Amino acid sequence: MATKLYPIGMQTFSEIREEDFLYVDKTEFIYRMTHTSGKYFFLNRPRRFGKSLLVSTMQSYFEGKKELFKGLAIEKLEKDWTEYPVLHFSLAGGKHMEKDQLVRYLLYILKVNEEKFGIVNDSPDPNVRMLNLIKTVYEQTGQKVVVLIDEYDAPLLDVVHEDTSLGVLREVMRNFYSPLKDSDRMLRFVFLTGITKFSQLSIFSELNNITNVSMDTEYAGICGITKEELVTEMHEDIQQMADVLGLSYDKTLEKLKENYDGYHFAWPSSDIFNPYSLLTCFSKRKVDSYWFGSGTPTYLLNMMRKYDFTPIDLGEQMDASKDDFDAATETMTTIMPLLYQSGYITIKNYDPETELYTLALPNKEVRIGLFRSMLPHYLAAKSAMCNTTVAKMSSLINKGNMDGALQLLKTFWETVPYCDNTDYEGHYQQTMYIIFALLTNFRILVEQHTFRGRTDITMETKDTIYVIELKFNKSAQEALDQINNKHYADAFALRDKTVEKIGMNFMIDEDKAIVLDWLKFGE
């Protein structure tokens, strides 16, 4: 039973503070941002990373609700606590809509804000309504207006891969945001959040002075939970988790890091934990996959197919310039910007000499979630059975019984229906990579470079390195011969582990069944 109240899924700052839920203090970031020379700010972070709570915290701050900030950093920093009128728009409800539906939704959220200030306006044009709302509130209160826009890109995410629909909905949103430029003298602060980055020209029209703080080191920890925050503010939670798991404090922290840590949105940056997964883990007292299971990234899988981005590509580290991944998604020529901005890959290193960033999957939760979501694309209806097979294989490999694990795999493949579009070696290599990548207890490398070529799959356990070569409609002996003739195993000769060489071959028999055969060196 959880002894602390965790704000899982909660987005309202006042509710969290008034009902004594855990709050990780981000108010120093808010003070810093609201006391610079800028007026327009943009931040993108992955879903469920605390963006909406950040916006709600800003709203309470600008509304002068000092009592909610007792004991927080901003209590000592802010002296005036001036109350400003706040317009808060959430576009979260604008998903899966056609043009007319989206316009009606925009009119609805405008009406909610109008009613807050006793304003009546029946114009059918969101542009006119927004401009009038800001002007009237400014004149009515005598104070400059604060505009907070949460999930600004929500109406566009589902159609980011559809050029026609994207253009239509993008124009609707441009029309909605355009009054911000004309209202400049009446605005105190404007803050927009979202998952992805759309170009200023396409969305914000003439609003060319917006400051994007998404990759600024000073704001790297504005969302999410840093390691420092975890070990200082949730020390007891880690210890309680350790007691449940039967592990030491340090081993439990290591397990939490392995599953939920690893994000960096700037470099240098503290390690950032996924807040939704971490808090859900503490609440349930169970290490599991929470973030990925909270929303199926259909649009992401669609884009991966569009850009021919494979599981092997996803599993490898990528070197890229900032412009390659911190780019507008609607003009991207690779999947990298969407993967990065959605939180499926993250910054792992930076080389100041080349100005190249190294990006990779952040942690175990994301890796397993992504690969599991890909299984239906490669195995159709058999993906659920594959998860069971993988779990059993992992147990056998841990016991050193690779033959038993491969026999399970052979039996599984015999249940997979043959399709003409899978009649090539690459399909089986990609599928096998997913299967092996789901063996989470082991280190898996695909097409690892050696001085004589590249191995198809290398798997490393605590005491054994398996060098695996795959063939299609050839023979396991031919695969094994390639390992030997090209001396793939020599790359591991100095490692203090047993090296086993395995040749595998897939064949389609006369009954259109998929048959897996394998041969180990020395047998």
Description of each model-found segment:
Residues 146, 464-466, 500:
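Structural motif
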Residues 432, 455-472, 486:
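Conserved catalytic cores of phosphodiester-cleaving nucleases, focusing on short active-site segments
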Residues 491, 497-523:
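Domain-level recognition of nuclease-like catalytic cores that cleave nucleotide substrates
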Residues 136-141, 435-462:
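Active-site metal-binding core of divalent-cation-utilizing nuclease and nuclease-like domains
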Residues 176-183, 337-345, 431-437, 482-502:
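Metal-dependent nuclease catalytic cores in nucleic-acid-processing enzymes
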Residues 1-424, 439-440:
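Phosphate-binding site recognition
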